[in-house]
Amino acid sequence: MRRLIPILLGSLVLSLSILVAPAASWAYPFWAQQNYDNPREATGKIVCANCHLAQKTTQAEVPQSVLPDSVFKAVVKIPYKKDTTEISSDGSDVPLQVGAVVMLPDGFRLAPQDRWSEEIKEETKGVFFTQYSEEKENILLVGPLPGDNNKEIVFPILSPDPATDSSIQFGKYSIHVGGNRGRGQILPTGEKTNNNAFTATEAGTITSIKSGKNGESDIKLKTDSGKVISETIPAGPSLLVKVDDKVEAGAPLTSDPNSGGFGQLDTEVVLQNPVRIYGLLAFFVAVSLAQILLVLKKKQVEKVQAAEGI
């Protein structure tokens, strides 16, 4: 039941965001939740890239090593130029929004809030985390969020403890990270969104351009063979053609309004055995003591030699 609570809350927040701002919300991680059991394909590609075709830089910061049963921060950085806007589904300009996915190794999960430091609480204010599914608590999602205030998203992570979970071993683990800014170009159904450049399907001459009541444009194109083709352009992209223009097949009819994109990367973290750390510290102490004793012994020998006149 406890695991269901975050999912139910996430669904509630998502539903409210769809009602309040449908244009900005439908391009985000819940599409992957609805259509894929695992957000990472066998090739290593995170499925968000199937809808967000533009590639953008995403960065991540995690500690080199962590101790068992400890809380650490995984920081996803989604850089872009401040005040960048995107087009909504009705064609209007809206602030760019961001989202992120962090795929942790088995056993790692979102840290309970009672273990968050004051610093983490401050850094995650206004951020709501959901797990990918009830069974995959090691896969965490965030978004959509206002981009200008969330170019860095902090994930508070709790490391597992091999002492209490026999399936966990000390060693190096991979973490897969994805970061997105802006809406996608393709819906899971395969349809194009209005966040695309639209091209002519065939060569011909533009014979008419009519505007619809919802901001869309209906372009009539007459081919050399006399066939008339209708191209419907949704609201948002700016037209690059006018009546009587001749176009080739594949020529752009509109600008490309997309200002976002998706990026992914892999990083690593070592689940460190504290016994090894204690052993290493003991080794350093022993070496330091040996060096000190060696210096003292050398000075003692020098004093004896000086007293004997050697």
Curated annotation (Swiss-Prot):
GO CC entries: plasma membrane-derived thylakoid membrane
Bilayer-spanning residue ranges: 277-297
Signal peptide (UniProt feature, chain positions): 1-23
One GO term of the biological process aspect: photosynthesis
Cofactor stoichiometry and binding remark: Binds 1 heme group covalently.
Main location: membrane
Membrane topology: Single-pass membrane protein
Subcellular localization, as worded in the UniProt entry: Cellular thylakoid membrane
Keyword Coiled coil: no
Cofactor section: heme
Gene3D superfamilies on file: 2.40.50.100, Cytochrome f large domain, Single helix bin
Alphabetical list of InterPro entries matching this protein: Cyt-f_TM, Cyt_f, Cyt_f_lg_dom, Cyt_f_lg_dom_sf, Rudment_hybrid_motif
Function of the molecule: Component of the cytochrome b6-f complex, which mediates electron transfer between photosystem II (PSII) and photosystem I (PSI), cyclic electron flow around PSI, and state transitions.
Subunit structure: The 4 large subunits of the cytochrome b6-f complex are cytochrome b6, subunit IV (17 kDa polypeptide, PetD), cytochrome f and the Rieske protein, while the 4 small subunits are PetG, PetL, PetM and PetN. The complex functions as a dimer.
Protein name (database record): Cytochrome f
Species annotation: Prochlorococcus marinus (strain MIT 9313)
Gene: petA
